[in-house]
């Protein structure tokens, strides 16, 4: 049995719904096709989100990302479509998708798209003093 690409995103219940925490994912092998030339475009996607009630299931995300391999789409459009589909599936408190497309015609393209759940406000950051570097020997 072979695994096939799919546009269906699956989720699971967020195990810690009482706390804001960030989930960070890196997807280094995204591919789609240039809608003008049909040539492949390659990108590294970085996904950061703060879940609410649902988290994205990794295998379904992999198959979803894979589904773009043979689709012709502009960088801006595909980044926003992926973000929109993730928002529909998870309804996160916050989500940011960064697409860093590799050079094409001497130009690198980066697209950043974000969504915030209505009424959600991030907690203020906590800045802690850093400690001096520790060594396992004393002088």
Curated annotation (Swiss-Prot):
Its EC number is 1.7.1.13. It comes from the Bacteria. It is found in: Cytoplasm. GO terms for biological process: queuosine biosynthetic process; tRNA modification. It catalyses: 7-aminomethyl-7-carbaguanine + 2 NADP(+) = 7-cyano-7-deazaguanine + 2 NADPH + 3 H(+). Its main location: cytoplasm. Substrate binds at residues 56-58, 75-76. The keyword Lipid metabolism does not apply. One of its GO terms (molecular function) is preQ1 synthase activity. It is an enzyme of class 1 (oxidoreductase). Pfam families: QueF. The keyword Cytoplasm applies. GO terms for cellular component: cytoplasm. The active site is at residues 34, 41. Keywords: Cytoplasm, NADP, Oxidoreductase, Queuosine biosynthesis. Pathway: tRNA modification; tRNA-queuosine biosynthesis. NCBIfam families: QueF-II (TIGR03139). Belongs to the GTP cyclohydrolase I family. QueF type 1 subfamily. Catalyzes the NADPH-dependent reduction of 7-cyano-7-deazaguanine (preQ0) to 7-aminomethyl-7-deazaguanine (preQ1). This is NADPH-dependent 7-cyano-7-deazaguanine reductase. The lineage of its organism: Bacteria, Pseudomonadati, Pseudomonadota, Betaproteobacteria, Nitrosomonadales.
């Amino acid at each position: 049995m072979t695994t096939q690409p799919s546009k269906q995103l699956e989720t699971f219940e967020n195990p810690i719904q009482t706390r804001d925490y960030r989930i960070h994912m890196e997807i280094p092998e995204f591919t789609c096709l240039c809608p003008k030339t049909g040539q492949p475009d390659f990108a590294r996607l970085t996904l950061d989100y703060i879940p609410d009630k649902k988290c994205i299931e990794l295998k379904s995300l992999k198959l979803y990302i894979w589904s773009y391999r043979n689709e012709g789409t502009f960088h801006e459009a595909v980044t926003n479509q992926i973000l929109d589909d993730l928002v529909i599936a998870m309804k996160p408190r916050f989500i940011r998708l960064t697409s860093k497309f590799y050079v094409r015609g001497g130009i690198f393209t980066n697209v950043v798209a974000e969504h915030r759940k209505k009424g959600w406000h991030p907690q203020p950051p906590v800045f802690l003093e850093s400690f001096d570097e520790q060594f396992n020997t004393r002088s």
